């Protein structure tokens, strides 16, 4: 409590002018997907990658203003930048079951299973997400054998920072 109180007594007033970026926004708006593409050493050529947005990444859209919540493109643009082929599928913006997994695993399994089935039906080789809870639900509750990765895992492979598993 003493540490917190000391921070609260800062002499400089906080005016709320700090811009906070999601890592995907940083890659798109600060680094630039074109510049990222130039740095790729292990492209995901021939890989069909389904982006899973879920229900929290883009909402509330007025507060986050990252992308169109109904028809987003930021992760598909990321997939193109790392050399993959984006897969568009019906369930990419739907809820995976979220926190309901704590109370009703069957409902979470139904929701996450629908997401994975939808991606697989469109020919996806893998799914990426930007939400840790979605990652958990899609991996543990969906019952699917389709691999699911956090988008930064593919970024690390594409940039040669992690052993490539994209062949």
Predicted segments, located by residue:
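Iron-sulfur cluster-binding electron-transfer modules in prokaryotic oxidoreductases
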Residues: 1-167
């Amino acid at each position: 409590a003493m540490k917190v109180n000391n921070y609260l007594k800062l002499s400089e007033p906080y005016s709320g002018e700090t811009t906070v970026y999601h890592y995907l926004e940083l890659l798109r708006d600060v680094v630039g997907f074109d510049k990222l593409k130039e740095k790729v050493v292990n492209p995901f050529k021939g890989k069909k990658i389904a982006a899973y947005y879920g229900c929290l990444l883009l909402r509330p859209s007025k507060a986050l203003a990252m992308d169109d919540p109904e028809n987003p493109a930021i992760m598909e643009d990321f997939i193109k930048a790392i050399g993959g082929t984006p897969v568009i599928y019906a369930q990419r913006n739907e809820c995976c079951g979220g926190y309901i997994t704590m109370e009703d695993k069957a409902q979470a399994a139904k929701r996450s299973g629908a997401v994975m089935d939808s991606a697989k039906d469109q020919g996806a080789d893998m799914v990426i997400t930007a939400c840790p809870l979605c990652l958990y639900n899609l991996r543990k509750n969906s019952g699917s054998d389709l691999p699911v990765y956090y988008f930064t895992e593919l970024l690390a492979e594409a940039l040669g920072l992690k052993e490539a598993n994209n062949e």
